[in-house]
């Protein structure tokens, strides 16, 4: 499947979430309409910018109060009391899983169970809530039915991606139409 760039890689929404990627936005020189004096910002671009101007300060580095552990992410109650005190919106801190890690106080494995003909999952896996040993798998599934199901899932995912690309293309056309 050939790849087409249908929209600018950095939209105002992407720029507001740039801390998720730990990157800084670059000027979009690839797009013919962006940063052109002939095409000023559209009303929808200005509306998005105004939306994000109303959001209160987002801190890049969390400050610690007495009694708060520096290793653990802030709990909901601590975050709520800090928001009430300071009126700040806190940027969520990402949790990176590498190998065996601890999330919510229990040790889990970050890797999904591997397909070995049957699903196998350890009790320490993050997937134990989804796939348990007690789960009864249907015994009537044959290989052609499994292949047909996988093909249907792939077609559905491709349709979703095509719909999303069409949506982005239409949004861009509407934003830059006179």
Swiss-Prot record:
It comes from the Eukaryota. InterPro entries: FANCD2OS (IPR027966). PANTHER family: FANCD2 OPPOSITE STRAND PROTEIN. This is FANCD2 opposite strand protein. It comes from Bos taurus (Bovine). The gene is FANCD2OS.
């Amino acid at each position: 499947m050939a790849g087409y760039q249908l929209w600018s890689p950095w939209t105002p929404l992407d720029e507001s979430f740039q801390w998720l990627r730990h990157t800084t936005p670059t000027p979009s020189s690839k797009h013919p309409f962006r940063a052109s004096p002939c095409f000023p910002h559209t009303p929808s671009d200005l509306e998005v910018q105004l939306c994000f101007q109303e959001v209160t300060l987002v801190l890049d580095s969390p400050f610690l109060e007495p009694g708060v552990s520096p290793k653990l992410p802030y709990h909901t109650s601590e975050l709520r009391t800090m928001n009430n005190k300071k009126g700040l919106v806190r940027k969520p801190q990402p949790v990176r899983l590498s190998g065996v890690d601890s999330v919510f106080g229990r040790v889990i494995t970050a890797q999904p169970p591997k397909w070995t003909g049957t699903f196998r999952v350890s009790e320490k896996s993050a997937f134990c809530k989804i796939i348990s040993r007690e789960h009864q798998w249907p015994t009537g599934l044959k290989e052609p039915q499994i292949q047909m199901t996988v093909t249907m899932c792939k077609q559905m995912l491709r349709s979703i991606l095509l719909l999303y690309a069409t949506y982005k293309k239409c949004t861009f056309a509407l934003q830059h139409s006179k």
